[in-house]
Amino acid sequence: MHRFFRILGLAITDFPTFWQRLRARFSSPRALPANADTAASSAAVYQQWIIAHDRPGYSARVALDLGPLAIPARQLTTRSVTDRRPSDGDTHIILLSNHTVLHDMAVFEFAALIQRCPSIALVYGDYDHVTGMGERINPVFLPDWDPDLFWSTGYLRGAILVRADLWDQRCGMAEDTTFESLIFGLVTAVGDTPEQIAHIPHILSHLPDREWIEPRPRLDAHFQAVRTYLQTSLPGADARQIEPHGIVDVRRPSAPAPAAIAVIIPTRDGLEVLMPCVQAVRQSVSMHPLEIIIIDNASENQATLDYLAELKADDPRVTIIRDDAPFNFAGLNNRAAAATTAPLLCFLNNDTEVISADWLDRLAAEALRPEIGAVGARLLYPDGRVQHTGVILGLGGVAGHGDAGRPADDPGPLYRAVASHRPSALTAACLMMRSSIFNRLNGFDATNLAIDFNDVDLCLRLHAAGYATLLLPAVELVHKESISRGDNRDPAESARFAKEVAYMRDTWGADLDHDPAYNPNLSIALGEAYSLAESLRTEPVWKRASRS
């Protein structure tokens, strides 16, 4: 450990003191000696180790098999996990989920991050699983902090670093405290300052493989923590578990006063897809006043023109805008958005069809959250396979759909195909946002991104303005993708597409190469989303230091 400090040009005194809290069920202590080895390797730097356990009267030294050369007795203290004493002046605590083994360099990685960012309140890392034979399998590469994914899945596992003053706020646990409720309490204590939660994109701990095989017990425990919190802290909210996986769907309370929603549908002929799209919207039941704006881009088919005329005559909620300019998806949406005063805009492709009856209310409840800039839905191909559950930056060069083609009942890595989470970008095939934000950002970029990537660009500008983008899979639509538009195969379209790709790379290159919602250990090659990257885009501090 001293060698790495020297390589980094740091003195040992530059690093904080850590307090390691090992939460262990001693009925199965086979993994604990490895943690003793980790502690022993750091004993010269970190002078006090506190082993917190849940078996009164049991010897932590015996359970950990700490020999005389491991940690000196004066450096080891045992406590009950329900101990209500504060952190006694120490700066940080490492919490481990049951039967977790620390990576040899985990403490160093935590210390290096805290040295750079001392105000960080909570830090987590990636993890893998260990079989009974000691084989490491099934690595889990996490995104940077995603509060909505955490509420849905409680994805923080393994080794969690907590600043001592945050621990003191939550000091003391009930006798039946679970790791899930403890972490949930610490996360909610951070509250409205999510920037104080950091992620180290490297494997820092090893969990027993039964957590991979049987995840339901921890998901049930997380659900109980969420439900308890909502009952006391967020009146009007509701949570349920989505079967068969057990992830949590949080339904937030409705706005006190309904906000009008303008659903904007660009179209050019394509009557066979436009009719079911509009019919589903018209039949939607919502507490919000509804306006439907169809912007017709030079339709020529008489049946389409007759249908639009009938719509306008039959339904006072429908507005038809004619635009005969060359196809410009961004410009069409901007023109329609400028024609309404509705507080909420829902951009909707004409080749989509709503499945979820309460889709407008669900999207609106999320779009009205102060921190949310835009909300998207889960989109399915007509054959039932997944088309969109969020966009991955950099995939295939600019951005792509990582879950495209996945079976509808496949939850995907970290349940992100079925759980609410914050991808870095969303498709505008179904996208709801506040008109005030849309107007402040000057809408879609109709000059540089007339057709492709204008939705990704808008999402990146939302992030730059301090807003998050949210995928709400509880809302589902069928998407018959680009039926009325066609493809990019002719030379002019190919040239236009290449120009838009170049604009995105020139404007957002650094962001496209570092998607915070997608772990840098994972591939960005087209068709290889969520597989291990052949060329890693990140490296642990200790590896960089060892080459110096």
Tell me what each language-model feature is:
Residues 2-72, 218-258, 383-384, 395-422, ...:
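C-terminal, non-catalytic tails of nucleotide-sugar-dependent glycosyltransferases
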Residues 66-72, 113-116, 279-289:
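Short, acidic, metal-binding catalytic loop of nucleotide-sugar glycosyltransferases
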Residues 80-88, 323-340:
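Glycine-rich, basic loop-to-helix element that forms the pyrophosphate-binding segment
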Residues 93, 345:
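Short aromatic/hydrophobic "clamp" motif used to bind/position activated sugar donors
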Residues 104-137, 192-195, 352-398:
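Conserved donor NDP-sugar-binding/catalytic core segment of glycosyltransferases
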Residues 136-166, 330-331, 338, 394-436:
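A recurrent flexible, glycine/aromatic-enriched loop bordering the glycosyltransferase active site
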Residues 166, 175-196, 200, 226, ...:
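A short, conserved alpha-helix in the catalytic core of glycosyltransferases
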Residues 282-325:
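Acidic donor-binding segment of Leloir-type glycosyltransferases
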